[in-house]
């Protein structure tokens, strides 16, 4: 059995830190903590009403997919990874990841609630797993891996969900950012994008550095490439990016570029050797996050340290 999975009687206490590399991932995530209420959506509704019917359809379904997917990710975290790992540092990371995934889920629900006024239509967005076949297919792939694979292979599949299944959708929203519209959506997208990249990198780091019995390169490629085919179908056929004016062939190339990057991180050879086709993706996420945090008012305090709690208050 992998050492990280062997029962550890000291798993309930974090000190002394024994795995500093894992602890650093936790501290990085802690430093990047944000809340859905920080995102200003006040200007988005005007832009939303100016979108074409096709553009609205695309954004609604992307948000529906994201809202459903975070629930699946959380189930894997809560039901499996958090329970299985015995290093307290890893439990800390999965704990904060679970909290952030909840914030992502709330963010997507707030976005849908803000943009979609028709209650029946809104309900369809909130129940995408029941109503959208394209979302169902991706969900089935993820759930099959969650329920039926070894810990080692689930790390690879989890990286595929975070790194491939979300990548086309993230990219399409950044495309809207490059057009100067939907600022609130784009700010949320930038923050979630960076969170999910960290989650993906953590799964890869665990496999590369804390797992002895790693899946073969052939198996890793099989998992990633099967996820790639589903994502290509989703973002270029089931919910084509052409609806918002993007080039589907370039999106396929972008997804192949993403998969090559993941393969290299896993220590495997590239499969496609393609270039990044979207120049706007190179800096936009970093710039958006920086601008967002710079725009915060100085009065905002995450922990509200300036507030005092009176123990005479009613609870």
Model-predicted regions and their roles:
Residues 1-315:
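Non-heme di-metal
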């Amino acid at each position: 059995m992998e050492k990280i999975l062997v029962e550890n009687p000291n798993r309930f206490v974090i000190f002394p830190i024994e795995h500093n590399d894992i602890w650093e991932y936790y501290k990085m995530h802690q430093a990047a903590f944000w809340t859905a209420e920080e995102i200003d959506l006040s200007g988005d509704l005007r832009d939303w009403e100016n979108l074409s019917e096709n553009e609205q359809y695309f954004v609604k379904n992307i948000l529906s997919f994201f809202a459903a997917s975070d629930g699946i990710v959380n189930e894997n975290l809560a039901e499996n990874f958090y329970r299985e790992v015995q290093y307290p540092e890893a439990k800390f990371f999965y704990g904060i990841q679970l909290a952030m995934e909840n914030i992502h889920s709330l963010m997507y629900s707030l976005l849908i609630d803000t943009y979609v006024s028709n209650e029946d239509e809104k309900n369809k967005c909130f129940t995408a797993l029941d109503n959208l076949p394209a979302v169902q297919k991706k969900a089935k792939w993820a759930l099959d891996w969650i329920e039926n694979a070894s810990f080692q292979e689930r790390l690879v599949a989890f990286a595929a969900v975070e790194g491939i299944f979300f990548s086309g959708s993230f990219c399409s929203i950044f495309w809207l950012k490059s057009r100067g519209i939907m600022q609130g959506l784009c700010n949320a997208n930038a923050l979630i994008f960076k969170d999910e990249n960290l989650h993906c990198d953590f799964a890869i780091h665990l496999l590369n550095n804390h797992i002895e019995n790693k899946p073969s390169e052939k198996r890793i490629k099989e998992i990633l490439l099967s996820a790639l085919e589903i994502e290509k179908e989703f973002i270029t056929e089931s919910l084509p990016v052409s609806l918002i004016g993007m080039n589907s062939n370039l999106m396929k190339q972008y997804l192949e570029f993403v998969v090559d990057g993941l393969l290299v991180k896993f220590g495997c050879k590239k499969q496609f050797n393609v270039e990044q086709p979207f120049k706007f993706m190179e800096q936009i996420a970093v710039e958006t996050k920086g601008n967002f945090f710079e725009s915060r008012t100085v009065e905002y305090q995450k922990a509200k340290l300036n507030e005092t709690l009176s123990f005479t208050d009613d609870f």
